[in-house]
């Protein structure tokens, strides 16, 4: 039989997920798409409590804020630009924007408190990185999660290096290890990293590849470094792993029919396929029957007869 694709043969997951886990998902909208499906199918998941985050430093900033439970204040409130008069913050996606600053603060701090409690108890953290490009607010000297349509003159566009990417991710791991050592109520955490298959074509095909390659190399440094610290050949005790979502779309699916109309975002069919591949990789075999039952139950409850 002719072989018509190059399948991505991912190794068996060393950091799996289970229905008994509490999971935090942070990062790009791909993380959000998969996270919503996991929640629909019965997993205990908190998804992007600051909204979609694209770069590694913004993910680190969100983790630090959850650990400190550092609430947002009026100083953090920014009026969105380009004629949008709503309020948000440079730490949030615009999905958090509200008409009044006080309403934004109320909702943002409520989400923060709920997320901080979930993060304290969760034992699995799944981080999906979208791009190594970021924007630094010049006056505040702060890498923002979202520019909020503010004037371009307020920012400097930067591309994180491999070292800066790996340092941000390693800092997340180190902070969690340190907190677990000093706080018995803080659950030790294992991490799954992945790179979003969403293509950022603002800088063209070559620029997108450079950005994604930076993320891949940064993740590889962290995962391989943590694996080297674990001397267990069977993978027991490993604290980080990598799921090849980007490679599956680029090398296995490899066709525009698996993309949405913008030719950059994966189609809903592709998201479903990646979720199936992820759970086949991460979920223990004995829980697949429960997964199928939960999928059937969800589809039945959301079925609308014609």
Language-model segments: residues:
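Extracellular glycan-modifying ectodomains
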Residues: 1-231, 236-306
């Amino acid at each position: 039989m002719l072989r018509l694709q190059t399948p991505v043969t991912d190794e068996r997951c060393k950091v799996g997920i289970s229905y008994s886990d509490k999971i935090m998902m942070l990062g790009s909208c791909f993380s959000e798409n998969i996270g919503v499906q996991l929640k629909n199918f019965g997993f205990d998941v908190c998804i992007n409590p600051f909204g979609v985050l694209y770069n590694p430093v913004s993910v680190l900033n969100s983790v630090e804020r959850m650990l400190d439970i550092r609430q947002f204040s009026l100083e953090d409130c920014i009026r969105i630009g380009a004629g949008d008069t709503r309020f948000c913050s440079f730490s949030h996606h615009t999905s958090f924007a509200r008409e009044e600053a006080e309403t934004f603060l109320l909702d943002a701090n409520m989400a923060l408190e709920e997320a901080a409690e979930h993060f304290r108890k969760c034992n699995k953290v799944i981080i999906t990185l979208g791009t190594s490009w970021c924007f630094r607010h010049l006056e505040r000297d702060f890498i923002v999660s979202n520019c909020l349509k503010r004037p371009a003159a307020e920012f400097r566009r930067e591309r994180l290096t491999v070292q800066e990417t790996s340092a941000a991710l390693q800092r997340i791991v180190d902070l969690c290890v340190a907190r677990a050592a000093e706080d018995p109520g803080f659950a030790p955490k294992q991490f799954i990293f992945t790179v979003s298959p969403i293509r950022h074509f603002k800088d063209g095909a070559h620029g997108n590849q450079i950005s994604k390659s930076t993320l891949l190399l940064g993740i590889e440094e962290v995962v391989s470094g943590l694996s080297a610290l674990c001397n267990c050949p069977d993978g027991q005790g490993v604290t980080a792993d990598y799921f090849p979502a980007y490679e599956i779309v680029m090398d296995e699916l490899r066709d525009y029919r698996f993309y949405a109309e913008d030719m950059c975002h994966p189609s809903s069919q592709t998201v479903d396929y990646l979720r199936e591949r992820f759970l086949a990789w991460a979920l223990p075999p004995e829980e697949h029957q429960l997964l199928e039952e939960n999928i059937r139950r969800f589809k039945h409850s959301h079925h609308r007869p014609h």
